[in-house]
Amino acid sequence: MLTKVFQSGNSQAVRIPMDFRFDVDTVEIFRKENGDVVLRPVSKKTDDFLALFEGFDETFIQALEARDDLPPQERENL
């Protein structure tokens, strides 16, 4: 099936035919290695989970990344 690509402000948009309409508010978009662009519905649970991370500022993210640089702790064998 073919559909139209058009401009919406500074973005490119695609008219999705009725047979392919989504029943969610959010979709994930990504490009596969072969160049295909894929739209995939995001479930409400996934959407809520991802929203948890929106409030983290740059300082918090840098602190998490710095933790990866810590050497492993040495502990007594059990």
From Swiss-Prot:
Record flagged with keyword Transferase: no
Induction: More highly expressed in early growth phase, expression decreases as cell density decreases. Part of the vapB1-vapC1 operon.
Documented effect of changing residue 57 to A: No effect on antitoxin function against VapC1
Effect of residue 67 to G: No effect on antitoxin function against VapC1
SUPFAM superfamilies, per database record: AbrB/MazE/MraZ-like
Alphabetically ordered keywords of this record: DNA-binding, Toxin-antitoxin system
Effect listed in the UniProt record for changing residue 46 to W: Now functions as an antitoxin against cognate toxin VapC1 and non-cognate toxin VapC2, forms a complex with both
One Pfam family from the record: MazE_antitoxin
Presence of keyword rRNA processing: no
Transmembrane segments: none
Function summary: Antitoxin component of a type II toxin-antitoxin (TA) system. Neutralizes the effect of cognate toxin VapC1 but not non-cognate toxin VapC2.
Assembly and binders: Forms a complex with VapC1, and a weak complex with VapC2.
Protein name as annotated: Antitoxin VapB1
Naturally occurring in which organism (per UniProt): Haemophilus influenzae (strain 86-028NP)
